[in-house]
Regions:
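A short, hydrophobic beta-strand element within the central beta-sheet of small alpha/beta folds
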Residues: 77-87
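Active-site residues of response regulator receiver
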Residues: 10, 56, 84
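Active-site beta3 strand of CheY-like receiver
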Residues: 48-54
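Acidic catalytic/metal-coordinating carboxylates
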Residues: 37-40, 62-66
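Receiver (REC) domain active-site loop signature in two-component systems and cognate sites
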Residues: 59
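Short hydrophobic/Thr-rich beta-strand motif most characteristic of the beta2 strand and flanking loop
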Residues: 28-36, 44
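Short, flexible helix-to-coil linker/hinge segments that flank and couple to helix-turn-helix
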Residues: 90-97, 101-148
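Short amphipathic alpha-helix used as the core "switch/output" element in two-component signaling
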Residues: 65-77
Length: 148
């Protein structure tokens, strides 16, 4: 099997370098491009083939949602996974509405990252376990409040 081709889009070079290092340890993954901004990613989009894009949410200039919308308008086949420090509902809702197929918190372990790549590359969706746990907890709280 060919390795998954991955692009990293994040304005923090230290984070990109660390994630690239972790992904390169995985025989099933190959980083084929990096961008420090949404604008840089959109400029490179036509010249790089990728299976999965890891997209930061909070970047200067175009944020992750704006970049995702524009990228998918050019390449509807792209599979984008959001990487963010922010797990609030407004962030992942915005990214899902923009067309992202997954959402990982930046404190996820490498096993979750690899599982997200495999799941999203195969056409599925992936949301970090911490995020799903938080979401279901909030939903239960709302249901309990509505029952009172």
């Amino acid at each position: 099997m060919e390795p998954y081709k991955i692009i990293l889009v994040d304005d923090h070079s230290l984070f990109r370098n660390g994630l690239r290092g972790l992904l390169e340890r995985c025989a099933a993954c190959r980083v084929v491009g990096e961008a420090a901004s949404g604008e840089e990613f959109l400029a490179m989009l036509g010249g790089v083939d990728a299976d999965v894009v890891f997209m930061d949410f909070a970047m200067p200039g175009l944020d992750g949602a704006q970049t995702t919308e524009r990228a998918l308008a050019q390449r509807p086949d792209l599979k984008i996974i959001t990487l963010s420090m922010f797990g609030e509902e407004s962030y992942y809702s915005r990214m899902v509405e923009a067309g992202a197929r997954g959402f990982l918190l930046k404190d996820s372990d490498i096993g979750d990252v690899i599982e997200a790549v495999e799941t999203v590359a195969a056409g599925g969706s992936y949301f970090s376990p911490q995020l799903l746990s938080s979401l279901t907890g909030r939903m239960r709280t709302r249901e309990d409040a509505a029952d009172e």
